[in-house]
């Protein structure tokens, strides 16, 4: 057996499914998960020594590539000072100031350790602020694994064909209303029917957990208008797209100002870190100022903050996002071109440093369209590319990520590998 196979067999004895997050298990695509030993730049290496071009980037955080020397130096500089204090630090003030500077809708921000904590806390805050219970989310949007958000969600739930997780009590799920993404008419009907009950609407302005699906400007404009009209809190879940699609996130791209924003991934630079923030009058309801309780032992961890702060500083370099977007577009268009040459039904889209690959005739705009993907053909493509040393997301329903160190040569090598993969699919 290969070392990957041996490790997977061993892992399954002590870890449910052999992995600590379901999509890593390769259950959707089949085969043996790759156990990663090290990474550098745009590449990582598995336990058997195979090198891969990495297009998951730890599911988004590695926008600078792996082991960026300045991020590494920033982390090494603070390691000797202590790993965790359970008390305030100057560095957490600095990262809060940086986030508020880069995302104008965020007047105050609270650090947490995961995207799930960020969305869970933001929703509790919205309920406390409005004194209402009902929340609205959208089919296929994934906002972490808090009970009220695991209703018709995306990400691993979509990968494994379970629209709602087992273990979510009906009494909790009943407070969550699920609408179709990008459906303005349905949204308006919902607000007309029970708008005065809605505490919050939470949305991925660029969905990345039912593959990459962009919100239409009209949809987000309607969300902003209706939330303002009915006094509901509009939450942008930018855990994935924040600092990924633009320096100011999707809200900069669309020109829409949410009341609260959830961030993660990039703001930790590869370390466990996330945040939620927004209007000062809403954030004032958080303890110790207000009655909405939220806490975390490792929130604002100094090592994670060091990595995140340096990452946020580096992505402000002139031309950073223009270069990142150009390279991601080069990848998406190149893959679409070679698929067309092979006459394989396929579409690709990109925004900033995110991309989506769809085994469909056109780019989807909703959960229902995403689920029309030819999953068996995607799975075959995934393994052809994996064998060629290219690691895409092991699911037809996950977005991909490009880093600033994925240069044209790396992207062109990926496209060349895809040419052979698509040709074999057409045979």
Curated annotation (Swiss-Prot):
Cellular component terms per the entry's GO annotation: cytoplasm
Main localisation: cytoplasm
Coiled-coil residue windows: none
Sites bearing N6-(pyridoxal phosphate)lysine, chain numbering: 265
Compartment annotation: Cytoplasm
Family per record: Belongs to the class-III pyridoxal-phosphate-dependent aminotransferase family. HemL subfamily.
Record's protein name: Glutamate-1-semialdehyde 2,1-aminomutase
Source organism: Paraburkholderia xenovorans (strain LB400)
